[in-house]
Amino acid sequence: MAVAERLRHLFRLLSQIRPVWVTILVVSALLNFVVYLGHVRAFFSENDFRLYYAGAQVGLRYGWSHIYDTHLEQAAVAALRPAGPWYALLTPAPITWLVAPLTLIGYLDAYWVWVALSLAALGAALWYARPRHYSAALYFTWWAALGPLWFSAYEGQITILVAAALLAGWRLLETRRDFLGGVILSLALFKPHLVLLLPLALLVAGRFRALLGFATVAAVAGVGMLVTLHPDGIQAYVSTLLVPKPGGDTAETLRSALGGGTAVLAIQAAAVIAAVLVAAHARRARAAWPLVVSALLGSFLLAPYWHPQDYLVLDVAAAIMLAAGPVGAGVLIAAAVAIVSTPVSPLNNRQGSKEMILAWLLFAIAFLGFLGVRALKRRERPTTGRQSALPPSIGSSASRRFQSQGPARDVSLNADVERFEAG
């Protein structure tokens, strides 16, 4: 009865405050859009797409083995108009292959086409991975209220495609298409530091076919880089990665925020252990969402560098939790990430304020801690126990709503979630 009472109270509370938080989300989305337009006008010359575009130009003109040549890259960036500062290209070489066709239409047009295609891909992934038990309009409004999405759009960042791949790949795992899910998830390797723990989580969770798909694409990309970059290009790329990062690149990492030391190592070790525990429990429960979410959160805490647009993957973690996790916890996480994403948005704190950094770190630690403790404390019990605690009215209406809004395969997803909660 206690569970039933909590559910009744939660549903009553959500229905009472729904107009308020819908209004807040709409206002936040509009404000983000206004600030985004201001950034495009004032800081267009500083976007990250320039680096992809310049790298593609260098590869086409001088050979792909030269795309990490500092002098050639600097010259290519300086030739773009409007001119802006140069930053080292840290993204793996396939990003330049992807952008290369867009060099045919010129830099300005290429930027807008790239952003439009990226947002279209994300929109398709959002629709595919959307929660079936919430309004799609509300879900998309929630996404529009998240600052990292708008900042990534301004930057022309590959992070948007990474987010799309993570959402679509997760949903494929939930529907038992593991190999294809692993292939799609591997697209996140455009920014490897965002998914450091994902292969380990797939391994521990027993998702071997997904890991095979992930590793296959990674191997093909690796061979492609070896063939096109040659030893000199590989050495130049490794040197770029090993060069001490500017303060702006590392300021938003756990190590930088806490100043290094034993505390950082302890938190990072705990993050790895928590991700492993969650993945092991997800293996027994046959659910994919916990392992993907915990891997993303743990990767953030381990990352050697982090940029404002990278917070988009934490928004992805919250979106997956909202779609597949426990209802109450999912709503709270979604509300928390909206709060963190908006008032301290990277659109308003381009260099990363201490408040923004600490807010994200605390969010990730609390979120991962919740999943880890949950996996540790849950004991095996029949899944019917939880179902019997639901009031008949809630259970039947929720079941009808779920079946009417989602495809048949989501019934298995819901069952997996139930097993994870009960297992």
Language model feature labels by segment:
Residues 96-97, 144, 188, 195-196, ...:
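Hydrophobic alpha-helical transmembrane segments of integral membrane proteins
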Residues 190-193, 220-224, 330, 334:
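Membrane-embedded alpha-helical segments of transport systems
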Residues 12, 85, 141, 185, ...:
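Residue-level detector of alpha-helical transmembrane segments in integral membrane proteins
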Residues 2-16, 378-403:
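Membrane-interfacial, low-structure loops and terminal tails that flank and connect transmembrane helices
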Residues 185-201, 303-310:
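Transmembrane helices and adjacent periplasmic/lumenal helix-loop junctions
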Residues 231, 322-394, 413-423:
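Aromatic-enriched
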Residues 2-180, 202-327, 344-346, 356, ...:
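Primarily membrane-embedded glycan-assembly and transfer machineries that use lipid-linked glycans
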